[in-house]
Amino acid sequence: MQYRTIRAAASAEFVEKRSRFIGYISPVTTQQDAIAFIDSIKSKHWDATHNVPAYIIREGNICRFSDDGEPQGTAGMPALNVLQKEELTDCVLVITRYFGGILLGGGGLVRAYSHAAKIAVDAGGIVTRAECSIVKIRCDYTFYGRLASLIPEQGGIVEDTAFEDVVTVKMRIPQELEPAFEARLVDLSNGTCRGEITDTVFADID
């Protein structure tokens, strides 16, 4: 299982006809975290004309947005549409606007909020996360060199290595790749090495 989300919290801004738009974005995993982020931006920009939120939470398939006083359909939905177009989840976006005295019109607002959302996404970066198996492998020193090459070849990442009477390697690998890795490991080691799955986590794979 894989999904796309924002790599890190970030912000970006631009000015359109003297109105200042600031897009804030952050990865989150719960609706409570999303609401807390929105509240923090509203507190920071308490004097703004509008603070327009949008968020998508993977668990429960939750999507929420608000126009926060802008004409209906001109702010929150365009911001949410950017997140959906990028196939993002587990992220929250707030676009702060300081009105500059010049009306943008409905189409102008849609374009401005869409652009603010897009530059915030670009600033935060997009990462793909996959459900990964944490695998522990014990091998002798003669096989370690082949194991060290095999892990990246099969799409795995070494997290820790302990050199004692034998070598113990802790690695992670996307779940869909683990069976093929295990088969290759057993084949190359003539059955002397096998992986033990100790945990399952979501981790960045790009």
Please name every model-derived segment.
Residues 1-74, 196-205:
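C-terminal regulatory domains involved in ligand/effector binding and gene-expression control
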Residues 75-123:
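Active-site beta-strand/loop microenvironment that shapes enzyme catalytic pockets
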Residues 147-153, 180-189:
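Short amphipathic alpha-helices in soluble, non-transmembrane regions
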Residues 158-162, 189-206:
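Conserved short beta-strand edge segments in small beta-sheet-based binding/regulatory domains
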